[in-house]
Every structure is written in C-alpha cells, then in structure tokens.
Design a protein with these regions (language model features):
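Structural signature of beta-strand start/N-cap positions in the alpha/beta core
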Residues: 25, 40, 75-77
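Cysteine-nucleophile active-site neighborhood
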Residues: 47-121
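Amide-donor transfer/coupling interface in amidating biosynthetic enzymes
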Residues: 35, 70-71, 103-152
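Short acidic low-complexity segments
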Residues: 27-37
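N-terminal beta1-alpha1 ligand-phosphate binding loop
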Residues: 2-24
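Short glycine-/small-residue-rich Rossmann-like dinucleotide-binding loops
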Residues: 9, 45-47
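Short gly/ser/thr-rich secondary-structure transition/capping motifs
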Residues: 21-28, 59-60, 125-130
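Short acidic/histidine-rich motifs immediately flanking catalytic phosphotransfer sites
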Residues: 35-45
Length: 152
C-alpha cells in the first residue's frame, strides 16, 4: 500500500488525486499506526526546511518512518521539501534532517562565477556518475526528466 505521509505540511490531496487518476490506490498516513501497512511512501512538503522538519518531528511518525525506511527497506519518494528532508541537513535551517541520504542540501548559486537562473526549470537528461539503486533498471540515454528546483 502506498502511504502519503501527512504531517501537516504539503499538498496531500494533490498526490491522492494524481495517483487515483492513473489508477493507483494510495492512502493518507496521519499517525504512526497508519504507516503499519505501508509498502511505499511519499513524503511531500511545501515551504521551509526547518518548519517541515519541526512538523514531522511533532507528528510522532519519525521513529516509525525511520524503521520502515532504514530497517524494512521500503521505498520512499520525497517531493519538494520532502525530498530535502531526506538529507542530513539544509543550509536553509538548523534542525537536522532525516539523514537517510548523507549530505547537506544547498541552494544553487553559481558555477565558476556564472550565476544560474533560479529556479532550475525544464526538461533535461540525467547522466548518473555511478551505479545507483534508483537507476538500477536504467533508462534510455534520450530519456528526459522534468526539473523544477532551486536546491541540490
């Protein structure tokens, strides 16, 4: 069962509607018990990193999420600030992230003195530098992915 983590920050109904439209059943998870039957997770989020982490920590779901993802190995997809929360920390705040992906989330600024337009928006190809569980099945070199983000 796909569970969309509802910790008070995010566009939960948009995800439920999208998945329903493509024929996939998903449910909202508001409590740790709601996560018991999760076989996949979506962690949405809108807004500031610290606010989102604060709300998740207050929700009481943090320990259950850690167990489901780290011990049980269920797949999780973070969207917007939900994806940023998977990291150790963010330069946008001081509250620690989930630390499921080691690293610090940073805002795009410039590369070699060239200021980058923000947000980074549009269709681009990916060129993975190393083998990743995310891309274990691979994809064709011509595959395009849509990006809309200001952080990496």
């Amino acid at each position: 069962m796909i569970k969309i983590v509802d910790y008070g920050v995010g566009n939960i109904q948009a995800f439920l509607n999208l998945l329903k439209r493509i024929g996939i059943h998903a449910e909202r998870a508001r409590t740790p018990d709601d996560l018991d039957t999760a076989s996949r997770l979506i962690l949405p989020g809108v807004g500031h990193f610290d606010h989102a982490m604060e709300k998740l920590n207050e929700s009481g779901m943090r320990d259950t999420l850690d167990r489901k993802v780290l011990r049980d190995g269920i797949p999780v997809m973070g969207v917007c600030v939900g994806m940023q929360m998977l990291a150790t920390s963010s330069e946008e705040g001081v509250i620690p992230g989930l630390n499921w992906i080691p690293g610090k989330v940073r805002a795009f600024k410039s590369i070699d003195g060239f200021t980058l337009p923000m947000p980074h928006m549009g269709w681009n190809q990916l060129h993975p530098e190393r083998t990743s569980q995310l891309f274990r099945k691979g994809f064709e070199k011509s595959t395009q992915f849509y990006f809309l983000h200001s952080y990496y």
